[in-house]
Amino acid sequence: MSYKKVALFDLDGVVFDTEPLYTEFWRAVFERYYPNEPQLATAIKGQTLTWIYERYFADLPDLQNKITEELNAFEHNMQFEYVLGFEDFIVQLHQLNVNTAVVTSSNKQKMQQVYTQHPNFKAYFDHVFTAEDFAKSKPDPYCYLLGASYFGVKPTECVAFEDSINGFKSVTAATMPLVGLATSNPIEVINQYTKVIIPNYLQVDFTDLCAVF
């Protein structure tokens, strides 16, 4: 058994315990504009803002601007709290010389809020991929294949950490080993995509994870 060379992390619900906050934000938005489709707040998890607008608010630039302003204000006041044990886990990866990157559907503007709250955030990762880097949104595998390509390794030499259904589908399509975070979906749902499921990073050993794949 050998270590995986690269660990790729989604952001919300994987690095930060923020996914429930976004669910409430988008639930309020869709209650206003799609009152008969309550499932949409969950269905969009893992998608870029551009994709959401193209899919649900196409040709409505004024409404898009209004939602963007609300989202920016929401994120400006958001507290980005790490998922339990994450900081110790990322240090563990560095000690094992495992390359690390964020693969998020969030945009660069939001990431500035992250960097302001956590000045050491960039030091945890070798690279941060954002929505602007992706030609296609999750569940397409593009973003995770890009992550593997950036480090010059095969997808099977990576391990991806995800929490959303669109994220699970993206990783699976990239033929990449998947660790599911049980922060956003019930275990029985995550089980459809991976049997490697963790509630957080407390007492998680990377070598043990690698031994499973």
Predicted segment positions?
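Asp-based, Mg2+/Mn2+-dependent phosphohydrolase catalytic module
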Residues: M1-K5, V91, N107-Q109, Q113-F213
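Active-site neighborhood of HAD-like aspartate-dependent phosphohydrolases
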Residues: M1-T42
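Conserved SAM-binding loop
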Residues: V15, T100-V103, K136, A160
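Alpha-helical elements of Rossmann-like donor-binding domains used by nucleotide-donor carbohydrate transfer enzymes
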Residues: E24-A28, W51-R55, D88, Q92, ...
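Helix-loop "lid/cap" segments that line or gate small-molecule binding pockets
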Residues: V29, Q47-P61, V114, A148
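Short, surface-exposed acidic
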Residues: Y33-A43, A58-E69, K122-F125, P155
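Metal-dependent phosphoesterase signature
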Residues: P38, E54-V91
